[in-house]
Amino acid sequence: MDRLTTGRGGAPNGRWEVAALFGFVVAPLTGLAAVAAWAKSVRSRLPEPIATHFGARGEADGFGDLSGTLVILVAVTVPMALVMGLLGARRRFPRILRRSLGPGSPVFVGFMAGMIADTLVPQLDAPTADGVVLQSTWSFVGTATGLAVGAMVAIVLKDPSAPKAESAPDPSLPRGPRSEPVRTDTSTGMKILAAAWIAVTVASLLLSPALFLILGLSFFYIVQTYSVRLRVDDDAVRFRALIGESIPLATITAAKPTRYDWGDSGGIGIRGVEYPGRPGNEAKRIAVASRSGEALDIDTTGTNWTIVVPDGTADALAGDINARLDRLHG
């Protein structure tokens, strides 16, 4: 059984989430098709050849035909949109991963469609493409529209309900009193990287608005676990990074302290990881990792989690969860 997929042979409400399919796949590709159709409709108003490449300051320095430009647009955009969109809509993946990946589809499509508009609008009715300067207005509009669509769809995503755990955790696991909420900050190296990324992103605005947008949007994945807060409540274990999740207490089967090494587990952030060397725990998990270090394994009847916590707190958090589960199961 693949615990990353929540152990379901088939999701009770279907394999796909309809709202996500529409917002992450259908709507973006429909918008892309509309932009491509508009581009073909204004072909007669464009110079021949058209400007297809621009220098650092936005001046045209490469030329080609409209058909080739649209083919490249479709060849680059559609596969990326399908990969991100379908991953975001597939119910077999936990909601937190779908919220991370799915919105990237409308954002990317909006950016690429905006780039086409920014390329062609300055050339409408121009006798020649020489001297044309690339705009950036439509790239920002397309990106903002895609971001709004992606965010709205991400908010309404749902996880199929996992069954309740049938018994209390193994008696050998730690028990303890109620724990305090904790916060884990990323490593110094990642803080330096984030600061450098911000500096480069701001500087790129002077060179290329398109590069600024790409770097700015990528920043989400750099800092999505910059700071992670976790607390144990009577009804759920709740954590929050840039996005968060609640793990219902009734679905938890065990909590135990462990360690997370980003070098062995695919990095930091929110990701699917696998620990083939752990006896009895070879299945995939969702890691919420701001750095390497002490972590908390939370096993459930659905998705399993590994959440990095401040050093010295994993035992107390695991003990609190297991003690609450003992009381829950009487």
Spans of features found by a protein language model:
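N-terminal membrane-targeting/pre-transmembrane regions
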Residues: 2-17, 121, 128-141, 146-202, ...
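Alpha-helical transmembrane segments and their helix-start/interface "positive-inside/aromatic belt" motifs
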Residues: 14-30, 94-104
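Active-site and channel-lining beta-strand-loop segments
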Residues: 38-70
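Hydrophobic alpha-helical segments
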Residues: 81-133
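Transmembrane helix interruption/hinge and helix-loop junction motifs
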Residues: 203-212
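Non-transmembrane, membrane-adjacent beta-strand/coil modules in membrane-associated proteins
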Residues: 239-306
